[in-house]
Amino acid sequence: MTGDRELWRVASDSGTVVCWMITCCEGAELQLIDGERIVLRELYPMKTDLYERARTLEAEYRERSRESG
């Protein structure tokens, strides 16, 4: 069974970045999508590690959004 889940979304003047978790039986993939483009793909055997990385990235992107806005 597979599943996709949007974890967060950050909008700024330059566009919107969306973080997705794509799951399958081998683990989970974290994807950052900026507009139509995948800008980051990372594989994790454990969802807990993926969630931790997603929180770190969200904080970074929210900070960038505040600085540019």
Indicate residue ranges for each PLM-predicted region:
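The feature represents the first ordered module of a protein
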Residues: M1-V17
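Acidic-residue sensor for enzyme active/binding pockets
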Residues: E6, E29, E42, E58
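Short aromatic-glycine-(Arg/Gly/Cys) micro-motifs in beta-strand/loop hairpins
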Residues: T16-V39
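Short, surface-exposed linear segments at secondary-structure transitions and domain or protein termini
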Residues: E26-Q31, T48-L57
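A short, exposed loop/beta-hairpin motif centered on an aromatic-Gly-Thr core
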Residues: E36-D49
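Edge beta-strands of extracellular beta-sandwich domains
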Residues: E42, S68-G69
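Short arginine-rich
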Residues: R55-S68
